[in-house]
Amino acid sequence: MQENNVQILVLDFGSQYTQLIARRLREYGVYTEIVPYFEKLDSIKSKNPKGIILSGGPASVYEKDAYKPDSAIFTLGIPILGICYGMQLIAQHFGGRVIKADAQEFGKAVLEIMESSQDSKDSSCFAFQGASQGIQAPMTLSFDIFSHHKFPQMLTALLDLWEDSVQASHIFLTKQHIAEIRLEVKAALQSSQNIITATDKKDFLGFIGVEKNKIEMLFVASSVFRKGIGKALLKEALERYLKDYPYILVDCNEQNTQGLAFYKSLGFEKVGMSEKDSAGRDFPIVHLKVSKAILKKALERGTSDSVANAFVCESERVFLRPYTQADFAALHKIVSDKETMYAWGQGFSKKQSQEWLDKQLAHYQQYGFGIWAIIEKQSGAIIGNAGLNHTEISLKGKTQKIVEIGYLLHRDFWGKGYGSEVARMCVKYGFETLGLEEVYCLIKEDNTASIKVAKRLEMQKVGEYPKPYKGKKISHLVFRLEKKVWQESKNNATQGFKSCSLFKGIKQDSIVWMSHADKVESIPQGFRELAKSGNTHYCAIADSKRKIYALQFHPEVVHSECGGQMLQNFAVGICGANTCWNMRHFAQNEIEKLRRIVYGGKAHCENPMSFMQIQEAFKHIGKAQTIQRLVEIWEEGARATHKDLSENEIAGMREEIREAILKSKNLLIAQKNEEWLGFIEIEKNEIAMLFVVPKAFRKGVGKALLKEAFMRYLGAFEVIKVNSLEWALGFYQALGFAKTGKKPIPAGSAGAFSPELIPLSIARESLQKSLGLEAQDSNEGVREKVRCAWATDKDEAARKLYEDYHDTEWGEPLHEDKKLFEHLVLEGFQAGLSWITILKKREAFRVAFDDFDPHIVANYDEDKIKELMRNEGIIRNRAKIEAAIINAKAFMAVQREFGSFDKYIWGFVGGKPIINAFESIADLPASTPLSDKIAKDLKKRGFKFVGTTTMYAMMQSIGMVNDHLTSCFKCNSSLGMQCDKILDFSQGTNTKSANLTKNPKNLHSHTANTRIVDSQHTESSDIKGQSHLESSADSGSAVSLRDFKSCEGATRGSYLEGNDRSGVANSLKITKETTSKVLCAVSGGVDSSVVAALLYRAIGENLIPVFVDTGLLRKGEREAVEKIFKENLKVPLITADASELFLSRLKGVLDPEIKRKIIGETFIEVFEKEAKKHNTKGEIKFLAQGTLYPDVIESVSVKGPSKTIKSHHNVGGLPEWMKFELIEPLRELFKDEVRALGRELGMPESMLMRHPFPGPGLAIRIMGEVNKADLDLLREADSIFIDELHKQSYYDKVWQAFCVLLNVRSVGVMGDNRTYDNTICVRAVEAIDGMTATFAHLPHDFLEGVSNRIINEVEGINRVVYDITSKPPGTIEWE
């Protein structure tokens, strides 16, 4: 199991703000932990983090006895980032001066970045504006998220921009139309959460609104039409919101010709048409669609095409571009200025300026480069010249041709760092673009500013040269910079700020939270200033050589976009942290960890090696992350086996490997416990790549990969080939490969950096034998490819169709939405027919149904239906055609709800296929409870022709269930993918399964043979002692039990005990090696329920979950909890009803603290009594509780460790005999992460999103004495409030909501009668973590409705009030 390896370690003393840092980094997939400042160095080293963050709150570095981190952390050689207090600590430790502030101050300030990456563009997209010099100069756009709730004052400005835009582009609209549509746009702006605005720091230039994968709004001010604003907004939306969708949709008015042209220029294609707009107006709407890949390329091309003539290279503030004749006036203004040209001795005349310009234009033609114009981005003005020039010099008596860099700045721009900026760009261009090995710079002896620049670039003085000019020889110093030095320079001076890319992508003038507490007045030696902000003395400093960075930002800044970006830059860009952590990894790891704890340090089984195709990896972790991880596998191996490789060679080979991986089709990845161990790529009959991580060397991984590849691909060829590296010859020759006799392939043939390769080959039978894959009596032979019995036909063409389908599709996991829709439609058409009929007509179906694009199919009209009914190539059944159209609409509705149909349908099996081990067709069921469940849900959503048998067949065809028979060669191959859900049917099947051959109506028929799929999760499947295994599968859990005694026997991927599959059934019997049990108190809340579900997945019936009904629960609480545990979680909950006991002991008690104490003591008493029933032999060894990360770190003191944990998060006060060993599975998680874990475990959203509920229950929501009558009254009122919140969709928008019975009576009027009844207080708050909270600004009409319902429906209440107190000063609960 891949451990949750710490990537970033945050050292802190318990600041709640520091939690945000860990949470934000985990959002980026970077696993982050928080430990106290006083953590021992050995403990820190043992965690082996890739980076450390020193955070903390207001504790001064001067505070007496305050704990400080061990200073030895600065010697570990890993990057360190100090934030707030961490910055002060760093500054003081390295000799800087820190001044103590009189008082803490926090506020917002403008961030001014002093230096940023010279190698990367500004993170904002560039639009272009005309400039006086006749060029296109980029205007820097700022992008912000618009929220009407936060910025209501901006609404009018955006509406005015919209109106300006449509008046210019929608000339067909009348004033009445515009006024009408303006109201609709206003409503959309008020309700949408995904609106991005573009400004030039003064005015709004445009905005875009998206919903899932659809562009709902895109408008640009008429003054900046055709200047790239629309593309810039689209690019920003693609990066923020649309990047996870394969296709992007947009609707455009047919009469908006400018808009249609714009979208079509970006690759959008028409996929449908509506005669009316969404409001029913007679405006035809064109439905457009484009793939993400095409749009991304179009936007990149659009940017580069627009900029191609504008710049050669760029930095944060300027870009360089070739001069044109139109630039003469601007050029002459600079070179004619005597002060600017002091190094030349005089200014240029117009003739000299023209001659110089002609020379550069000629150089562009001759060399492709020369001296270029420096364009300041902000103004668009030419401010000088910079570039490279061919020249000849004599150095140490030897004449040589060189390329020199040079620049000239107008005097108004001296002393502002532009010299270093343009010099760095020229150096980079020379080395990276021109491929030079060295560059020179010739500087006059008295030009001290330029000499400083040369030294900053680490150029070395190599001599002097008298440079001729106008008949004179002017002495110049000669500086040289070698490429090797430039590359190896640790402080990356020539690359600008790349090594310290803390501010990469951060916009200049960003608004950030600042901490004006103790300030750094002077920075230590070796540090430099990175940014300024507000009135802090120093805002950001760094020592890039030691990789130590410090920020004065208040940790609250991590809430912001730029704060998150800085953290990501540090973790990923500087520390090289991987971003593969996710909740699934955590869940799987935690299950294994819990088993080891409970079962005496031993996990119940060693998970086998499994294999997945690269396409599956793309689906799980994304394309970029997959390729990065594969390249890392290659690089680790390369560095271990080729220690003589230079960094330059590694870098070159890395890119070649990346390209090869990108182009690969048949690439398999070996993994064990989610850890990637190696990969193999096959091209026809050739092994193209085979790489293994060093720690897996000589452990059979390479052979296992080759074995898997043989089973899947290579077994079809007579001869298998490979071009081997010299050092790998032994591996291949041991398997029987021999040299072909051909000459070795020279180094550099396959790629610029490819090494020499030796051609090898082997006969199929020989490799089959050496891999241990010889044919056995059990029909495992590869030679003849024994298939499932249904995959044949008397007709040769039909048999070939069946075989191809069986070998390449059937049972293979499918995740592409369009293909899933195809299968859904074809399964419906197949109903009542043989599957071979579908296979023969499939290509015709694809043409007829527009390649099964649901967006197109959903818009089919009567004419299209008639056209399809005339198509002889398909099955002409009107009901099924109409069903396909209906299903397309329902399919898109599912996509909108779940993000993709794939996510919805695979959610039924937790994202992993169910793999069965049937021996004959007679064992196969026609349907299962799971297919029943899917069919029922699809029908509820409006789908047609989705009966349970049809759905079972579809589950098989898309690989949700794998029913390849044990005799089939694909069974071994597929079993390598997952062992999580293999179930044992060897002990018997139900009557329905056993009698399939007697009842042909149950068969999903191909021809005379039967295509039937998926295992049944029923009681008849006899897995003794493991009924919870079926439960796990039924619940759709993404994390299923792996508690198999000999799990490796169930999958061919282990290779620890050969390839014997005879023990599949027996391998699934679990033996209980220990009687240790875990006691868990369940309250019905999110935390304890997740703990119980997680533990049950890990240890099954060794968990004792106890739910105590105190009688203080909300209406229907007990019934809801019991139902969820029984039906959703499949966890056998033990309920102890002690309601009467609790009420009797609370009688007459008024003081809230005494209430709490009584409830706590009574709970312990009941809990103890229930525990004793299950501990007769001392089996209970552990106590599980839902302690979260905030509970752990909030207990840490500034001055040292504290063993106390907040009592309301624990079962405190347990008797001595119950002092079990504590298990806290959630102690590394935050509340939102606990919910994410619950989703992975298949828990229902209704449970996960429940509001917090206090341990003492309703007792502290009744002011005064607690009795049954008041509890019933409060339950009714509270139930009404919660019900209304759900109805109006406010429930999920507030952190917590409830009613309080004040026990304050007041006079009221009901009809003609006066009343004197009780008062209910309604409370709702908004919060992030409950540390602070503000009252929810619920609409008055909503509150009025709640009040009316409570007063009318709850007898005894005649007044309702709303609590508008925030925290602080108040608390969320009343007692």
UniProtKB/Swiss-Prot annotation:
Keywords: ATP-binding, Glutamine amidotransferase, GMP biosynthesis, Ligase, Nucleotide-binding, Purine biosynthesis, Repeat. Residues 7-119, 501-580 form the Glutamine amidotransferase type-1 domain. One of its GO terms (cellular component) is cytosol. Pathway: Purine metabolism; GMP biosynthesis; GMP from XMP (L-Gln route): step 1/1. ATP binds at S1083, G1084, G1085, V1086, D1087, S1088, S1089. Its EC number is 6.3.5.2. Residues 141-300, 318-484, 612-765 form the N-acetyltransferase domain. GO terms for biological process: base-excision repair. It catalyses: XMP + L-glutamine + ATP + H2O = GMP + L-glutamate + AMP + diphosphate + 2 H(+). It is an enzyme of class 6 (ligase). Residues 120-500 are annotated as: Insert-1. Residues 1014-1027 have a biased composition (Basic and acidic residues). The active site is at C84 (nucleophile), H554, E556. It comes from the Bacteria. GO terms for molecular function: acyltransferase activity, transferring groups other than amino-acyl groups; ATP binding; DNA-3-methyladenine glycosylase activity; GMP synthase activity. Residues 597-1071 are annotated as: Insert-2. Gene3D superfamilies: 3.30.300.10, 3.40.50.880, 3.40.630.30, HUPs (3.40.50.620), Hypothetical protein, domain 2 (1.10.340.30). Residues 1011-1036 are annotated as: Disordered. InterPro entries: Acyl_CoA_acyltransferase, Adenine_glyco, Class_I_gatase-like, DNA_glycosylase, GATASE, GMP_synth_C, GMPS_ATP_PPase_dom, GNAT_dom. Residues 1055-1250 form the GMPS ATP-PPase domain. Catalyzes the synthesis of GMP from XMP. Homodimer. This is Probable GMP synthase [glutamine-hydrolyzing]. It comes from Helicobacter hepaticus (strain ATCC 51449 / 3B1).
